[in-house]
């Protein structure tokens, strides 16, 4: 039976290092002797239910760890469930009891170190690169046991589309990229190709061949096929390591790149510069024949370089871009890769790329920027020296990317511990039940205090293409080391509320200087246009995005400003200014003023805002209005808020809820769920906007109807149903945030209970 282990309890490894005793660490371990018959039956039932309903609900409910934690804590829901018949007759007690039921349920799910675990996955292209890398390095059997493989196969089979392919995420249509690499993964795991049958492999291979073959894989896929030896580097767009020599005054250089692309490309450029290819095996030779409609020896690789299946092509590749990459290829391969320049420049560039890799690996404790760069870095370190400590340190961190749920084993981003914890704590702090959950609040506050970055990256970090981090919070844990602006804002919001509480109640508080450090980070990250970026201060010219070689997502070259990050920053800085009116007051005021103008400038004609990190226009509208209201705006004095309220009232469904399709994100226009169904996460977000927009003072019925939906949706144990996938990454890749079904619904009920209490 699989069990989730937290922090130092997950065991130690001499090749692991940590900044805070592995706080937030999440490791899944298999124990063949664990679990009673009843527990094993419960897990099997959850798996079967997902498989039976996977065509309707493709994002899992993340049940396995929840079952485990509730059992370990002997949780029993003692507050009676509420059922509403008439929305007009909801009482304060009805809403409050529903809220308390949910709060008590969430308190039982808190880990011992104070955070809330959760899946943060959904991308179908994360698993296979880990399998390919470990196959190449000869460590596949050491890292992935038979039980790991069983769960990985479960995941692939559960999320294979009816046409035989796999999408970029669990919701999407089939992509060449994901179908090819998942096919390879199946073959590495020993699944027979079964060319004439109806097996997963046979259907996947048919899809690949019917759509032109693996030469139509986008760049990331081509890179993995090249290192495996089932594609040729000459068929890839160039990734020259000489790029890292570009000085800071160049329009594009290592410092201007979007941090995630930078982290990925430094390892890709190393592998490209060395033209590394794995030693051929019988399986590799078979794959060369299975992935293409023509013989491998007859493929013209130069013609394949710019190919991309139409199913994968989200960000169009222009003629200007094609010309640009042809010129780069000519210069890179015809000059830099030939004598004497290969000795004078190329070899030095390869060494420089590896120096960057080692620096960034050490600075992130070998977690790197996420699942995509992690595995490229790991392979590059093995190519440099298979016996090196660098590679062994990478191997020791692979388990940190593994998550197991009822749909199987998936590689996740690296976790959303801080992000989810900050939201859950804000809900609990707003629920007015402090005395009932004091130990939960104390542990949560401790987790945030200990997870803040107290130093900048090590050494000469500017020349190593890193930005400041002191005072920030990351997305997952302190060890990873990358500050994220909205995680800073939401975590600081919690810490400011805790700061206002008595020490007798909450215990040890953060030093005020650390609160100041967090504010300094936010002020630093605001751009001239008033928006705030997410990982680093934005730099570089926007026209550079025209040159992006990444076909399946958008805005990948540069750091950008984001609506949600700006809204969150305004909220917390408005609170900070009230609690600490003497610290950088004028700068904070200026930040808020510019931030409000930025938010208003992004509003769409229908009154909504596009959400960059959630689904989508409802999500964006929530963060926008939250920021506007925190800055002192109201329905009466702000046209933007009035338009936002009208937008939500216009799209409220007959049931009283809201539900938005993930298709809104790539299409960039509002699309309701099929059948105008309700989603509790969107309903919670919309309900909060209406209350913040003063709807209770004008016509409270739409709010009451939405509250009825949430109250009646709550399950017997206090949980809410997992319905649709609710996160997104770079417009076109969906992410599963199962905890959103709890945090946004309960957060909405905190607003609602306070609103109806005022009517008493």
Swiss-Prot record:
Active site: 486 (proton donor)
Gene that specifies this protein: PEN3
Function as written in the Swiss-Prot or TrEMBL entry: Converts oxidosqualene to tirucalladienol.
GO CC term, one of those recorded: lipid droplet
Protein's UniProt name: Tirucalladienol synthase
Start-end of each PFTB repeat: 149-190, 641-682
UniProt keywords, alphabetically: Isomerase, Repeat
Catalytic function, reaction form: (S)-2,3-epoxysqualene = tirucalla-7,24-dien-3beta-ol
Enzyme class: isomerase
Naturally occurring in which organism (per UniProt): Arabidopsis thaliana (Mouse-ear cress)
InterPro entries from the UniProt entry: SQ_cyclase_C, SQ_cyclase_N, Squalene_cyclase, Terpene_synthase_CS, Terpenoid_cyclase/PrenylTrfase
Family: Belongs to the terpene cyclase/mutase family.
PANTHER family, sorted: TERPENE CYCLASE/MUTASE FAMILY MEMBER, TIRUCALLADIENOL SYNTHASE-RELATED
EC number: 5.4.99.56
Record-linked Pfam families: SQHop_cyclase_C, SQHop_cyclase_N
GO molecular function: lupeol synthase activity
Single Gene Ontology BP annotation: triterpenoid biosynthetic process
